[in-house]
Amino acid sequence: MITPSSSQSLGMKVQMESEQSPKLQEELDRSPSSVDGSAIRNGTDMQTESPAEATSSPVEVAEDPGANLFPPPLPQPRICMWKYLDIHSMHRLEKAATVEKMREVLAELLELGFPEQSLRDAIILDLFSHALIFCRQQGFSPEQTSAACAMLQDLHKACVATPLGNVEECYRYFTSVLFCHGIRRPPFSIDLFKEEQLLALADYVVNTYFRHFKLYKYVFTPQVRLDLSLTYTGLQPLTLWPEEKENEEMMVVEQVATPQEEEPETVTEPEQQPSEVCILQTYIKSQLSKELRQLQQLVEERLKESEERLSSKLAALEQPFQTPPSKGKTKTK
């Protein structure tokens, strides 16, 4: 039998559980991101520390792009307002009256050395200067312009982080960063842009950066070279003699006084014992010659048929044209 006091205690417990459930849900929602973030940080630390322990010079590690065959994980999408261009930088850019002045201020803010001498710095300067011009044309506020430039810079960093192809991952990352600035859900996202502004910014980035995605990756990432090696089953591995060994053998033969009759024997000994490679080469040559003969015979037959058709048509054209006899007789006066 349930007493009023027990029912009240049950009600209190249910109320406490209902109040704790959203908190637990929020903690569960946050826990994967925190675990992922810690895993990403640990992964990056391992990647940066293990080459330093393996080699003494870090320059050699940086020049080896094929050490890791998998692209690095992309960062978590976050709010990036005032991330690279703060409010003072935006005021300096707004005061620039001409495009040349704006490019000078932008090169100073982005810490670009000499864009006239470095092609990469010139490309970065063109990328962000055109982005600023687009933001001015759309009437973006300083906060929106700073966030748009930060999103573009984070996208560029994700692109050049690996020489491997990751255009789909970068596009998903860019769209998730856009949503962080279009939906009001603090502290994860804010409604900084309107829907029309988000669509315009997305179209601009797709038509400019993603259209030339491979060009940016080609310029800003090191070239990866893959060497292909083939192994044939059933064949013994070839033993290649270097030229130094051949020269040493020739010197030994010259030093040792041997009759000249033995020299041709030493030269002809390898020819008397054909290797499996020679047998394979002769077989390939015989098959190729056989196929070539069949192809030549087929071409000759086709040419002969075409000549016969042409000769029959010419013979039909050379025959005199015979007019049919008239039915009516001509009348004589």
Swiss-Prot record:
A single cellular component GO annotation: radial spoke
Post-translational modification Phosphoserine, affected residues: S34
Main location: other
GO biological process, one term: sperm flagellum assembly
Keywords from the named record: Cell projection, Cilium, Coiled coil, Cytoplasm, Cytoplasmic vesicle, Flagellum, Phosphoprotein
Coiled coil residues, start to end: 284-319
Cell location: Cell projection, Cilium, Flagellum; Cytoplasmic vesicle, Secretory vesicle, Acrosome; Cytoplasm
Positions with biased composition (Polar residues): 1-10, 44-58
Superkingdom, natural source: Eukaryota
Claim: Coiled coil is one of the keywords in the record: yes
InterPro entries listed in its UniProt record: CLAMP (IPR032727)
Region (Disordered): 1-70, 309-333
Phosphoprotein as UniProt keyword: yes
Full protein name: Cilia- and flagella-associated protein 119
Species, as recorded: Mus musculus
Gene name of the record: Cfap119
